[in-house]
Regions:
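Rossmann-fold scaffold of SDR-type NAD(P)-dependent oxidoreductases
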Residues: 9, 81-89, 113, 138, ...
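Conserved glycine-rich Rossmann-like NAD(P)H-binding loop of the short-chain dehydrogenase/reductase
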Residues: 26-42
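The beta1-alpha1 cofactor-binding region of Rossmann-like NAD(H)/NADP(H)-dependent oxidoreductases
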Residues: 37-38, 58-72
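A glycine-rich helix->loop->beta "capping" turn
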Residues: 50-53, 73-86, 92-94, 179
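Short-chain dehydrogenase/reductase
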Residues: 71, 121, 167, 205-208
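Catalytic loop of short-chain dehydrogenase/reductase
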Residues: 90-110, 115-118, 122, 129-176
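C-terminal helical subdomain
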Residues: 175-176, 182-188, 194-231
Length: 231
């Protein structure tokens, strides 16, 4: 039986690296991508050194040409994808409200957190269509919830709300071919989350890996701790 194949973006550290590790330990072949080539290769080498089937590809999700090259490379080898985990993202908000956030900050945040995942999902869809159980997992945030929204981090929150709507749209348009879900990993102790966060990276990765691997996952939902939450 062929190994299942996943690609995880923004996987040079934190939740991304942990998702790669957990998938690879389930005997998956995992493609680890990162914008920072040195950090990405080191993360890949560390995991491969444990006997895990992990390969590195450099990817800047804000660069359409880079996305196109990656899609062409993956078309040649391995020629198929089962799961895309859109994990790469940025938190660039200054300590100010939406009335004072700069358009440049909003634009750059949207490029990384929304346009990048959208373009990558479109580019890799032909490879996902070759799978008999394809999935896209979009790593979102509770800050993107319209039902529970509050002030703070406006650029990040807006970008994650857009990512959630992308999930809804793709889930409907790809129904029967690719299952698409958003997931909130919670407040995780990463470079983005900070040392005061309440969750380990292992816990943060848990629902992402569940959406990638469990045979009974839903479609078009927002998930936290393996349970559906409101948009």
């Amino acid at each position: 039986m062929d190994k299942r194949i996943a690609i995880v973006t923004g996987a040079n550290r934190g939740i991304g690296t942990e998702v790669v590790r957990q998938l690879a330990e389930k005997k998956w072949k995992v493609i680890l991508t990162a914008r920072d080539e040195a950090q990405g290769r080191k993360a890949c080498e560390d995991l491969a050194g444990r006997g895990l089937d992990v390969q590195f590809h450099r990817l800047d999700v804000t660069d359409p040409e880079n996305i196109h090259r990656l899609a062409q490379d993956l078309k040649a080898d391995p020629g198929r994808l089962d799961v895309l985990v859109n994990n790469a993202g940025v938190l660039m908000d200054e300590d100010r409200g939406s009335d004072r956030i700069t358009i440049e900050t909003l634009r750059r945040t949207m490029e990384a957190n929304f346009f990048g995942p959208f373009q990558l999902s479109q580019a890799l869809l032909p490879l996902l269509n070759r799978s008999d159980d394809a999935r896209i997992v979009n790593v979102s945030s509770g800050l993107g919830q319209l039902s529970d929204g509050g002030g703070g981090y406006p650029a990040y929150s807006i970008s994650k709300a857009a990512l959630n709507m992308m999930t809804v749209q793709l889930a409907e348009d790809l129904k029967g071919r690719v299952k698409v879900n958003s997931v909130c990993p919670g407040w995780v102790r990463t470079e983005m989350g900070g040392p005061g966060a309440t969750r380990s990276v292992e816990k943060g990765a848990e629902s992402i890996v569940w959406l990638a691997t469990d045979p009974m996952i839903p479609n078009g939902k927002f998930i936290r701790d393996r349970k559906e939450i409101a948009w």
